[in-house]
Amino acid sequence: MGSLNHWISEIRRPRGETINARKIKSNRYGKYQRIKYYILLLFLAAALLGSLQIGLLDPLSLLARSIGTAVLPTIHTAALGLLSWVKELGLPILATAAQSTYDLLGSLLLPYRQAHFHGILIIGGFFLTVLILNRLITRFWCRAICPLGALLGLFSRWTLFGLEKDEVTCNHCNQCLIACQGADGPDVGVVWRQPECHLCLNCQAVCPQSSLKFKFYPQQTVTTANPAGTQKVDVSRRAVMASLASGVVLVPLLRSGDAFEVNSDPRLIRPPGSLPESQFVERCIRCGQCMRVCPNNALHPTMLQAGAEGIWSPVLIPRIGYCEPTCTLCGQVCPTGAIAELSLVRKVGNETVPPNRIGTAFIDRGRCLPWAMAIPCIVCEEWCPTSPKAVYFSEETVVDRKKDEVKVKRPSVDPQLCTGCGACEYACPVTDRAAIYITSVGESRSKRNQLLLKTRNMSNPRDETS
C-alpha cells in the first residue's frame, strides 16, 4: 500500500524552482501527521472491547478489499468493452488483434469469469480518494491516516538504525526535503522525527555533500535547535485520552442499533462456517478475501444490513450466486477465523454429521408459477443439490382461466433437508424477484435463529448459545 501511494505521489511530477519550493513546504513536518496515532488508539481501544473495526483502515485489508472488489472488476469491464469495440469496427486485422489480445490477457491477467460486487462505488470511491490525496501531499495516506504506520512509529523508539547529520558539511540546499517521503525533518538544524521516517534513504542518496548517513547507533548532534537529537512521537495527551475514550464508546454505540440483534435483516446470510453474529463482526477485518475467492460470486460486502459494526463484511446474495455445496474456499482464506475452515464432511454432512446450514428456502406462492398461475415449472427442484432433495412436489390438477384442467407440480420445501445454499433462488425463472428465496433462519451458527425454538432464555435474549 505504501509503495502504491509513493508511485501515485511521484508519477509525472513537474520540475522547476516553484515546484521544488512547494515540495519543500509540504515535506516539512505538519501537525496533521498526528492524526494516524489518534486513529490507531481509537481502534486499539475498540479492539480491546472485542471489535476489529481497524480492518476498515488497515492498509492490507484496504488494499485487498479495494483491488478485489472494485479495481479488478473495473479493469476487466473496461478492457472487455474496449476490445469488443475494436472487434466490432469491422476491420479483420483489428478484430484478429483484439481477439488475440483478449486471449492473452485472459490467460495471464483477466479471470475466466469476472465477479462483480455490491457497493463498489463507495469502496472504489474511498480508495480513489486516498490515491488522489497523495497527489496533493506526498504519501498523505502514510503520513496522516495509516494505523499500521502509526504502530510502527510507536515501536521506532527502540530502533538501532537511524539518521546521522553532519552540520559542518551541510550547505542547506534542501535537496533532502525535496526527496523526503515522510516529512520527518531530514535537513540539518531541525529535529529528526524518527517515528515519521519511512527509511526510503532518499535524503542520503540526493545529498551532494554526503551530510546525511543512515547507520547503526548513529551519533545525534545536540544543538540549541535540536536539544534531544531525535523527536519521539508527537501527540497531545488530551487528544490521546479523547481517542481512547472514543474507542471505548464506539463499540456499545455501534451495537446499540436495532440491526445488530433485535431487528436483524433476515436476508443477512453469512458464509458457511461463520461464527455467531456477535463473534463474527468482532473478528472480521473486511479484507474481502472470501468475496474474491468465491467461485460463484455469491459473497458481497454489506452496507448497513448488519448494522454499522458489520459494514463491508461478507453477505451471501443468492440471486447473484449460490453457495457451491462442495466449496470451502471462504473458510480456507479467512485470516482471522471469522469463517471457520470446514471439511467437506462438515459442509455437506453424512449419516452421523448434519450439514452446515446458512439459511432456509421459502416459497412465495403469489409469485411461484405453478402456485399462482398454473404454469408448469420444476426449476427449483432440479437445481436443489441436497440428497434427498429439499424441494419436493405435490402433483395437483387445477383449472385454468379457460376452464381446462392442468396438471402442475407445486413445490414445497423440507426445512430439515434445506441448507440454504440459494441454488433454487439463483435459478428461479421469475427474473425480477425470485418466487423462492432464502433467509438466514435455520442457520447452524445460531441456536436462536431457528424456525422452531425448543427453549429460549428470556433473561438473556441476546444469548445465541442458549
PLM features: what roles do these ranges have?
Residues 1-466:
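Non-ligating segments of multi-cofactor redox enzymes
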